[in-house]
Amino acid sequence: LDDTKKDDKAYLPIEFKRSEAHKKSCNSIRVNSWKNECLYLDWNEETKNAKLKNIANSIISYGQNGPDIIALQEVENNNILNQLLDLLKPYGYIDSVLIEGKDYRGIDTALISKFKIVDSMLHYIKFSGEFEGKDTRPILDATLEVNGEKLKIYNVHFPSGFHDVSMRIDPLDVLSGLLKSHNYPTIALGDFNVNTKEDSKL
């Protein structure tokens, strides 16, 4: 399930983490918790299956058989998303979408739904000012068919609070433009990474 072209070296079985090259790469990570994951996390089949089961159990514990629509962030690929969908199919989930973005770590946004997903695309963020040319995760745009009507879903994963607040303003502007571009019922959700101090400013 590993994306070989992505920098996701934390999520590998421990036997792949014993080389000096791997250790050197991990030790260059400045955040200790991330460094420790990179060095010591044993991401094997058993660990992966337990994680999927825990996520599925959390989802179906909400209400009766889970929410109608699930927005996910930091999903590695369609392979793992489909495994989660398979666990959820007995509870009425029928469709999913993940479009591979350009994130170097290979983590993307995704949707799982009890309604048919009829269209989907990514909207990339263009930063302005001093952050022009920087990259971030795009907004996932999905169109669902609900009782014969279209419903638009925007799933976001904005830059973390580690970054300057202006790096969340540009994505919010893109989202605002998308909301104004049509008259369909819309839900915008996901990880906005806006803290309480920023909330009043944005």
Task: Please name every model-derived segment.
Residues 57, 68, 93, 98, ...:
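A broad "ordered helical/assembly scaffold" signature
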Residues 1-87, 98-101:
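N-terminal, active-site-proximal structural segment of metallo-dependent hydrolase catalytic domains
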Residues 36-40, 93, 156, 160:
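Generic alpha-helix detector with strongest preference for long hydrophobic helices that associate
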Residues 65-66, 106, 182:
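Short, well-ordered loop/turn elements at secondary-structure boundaries
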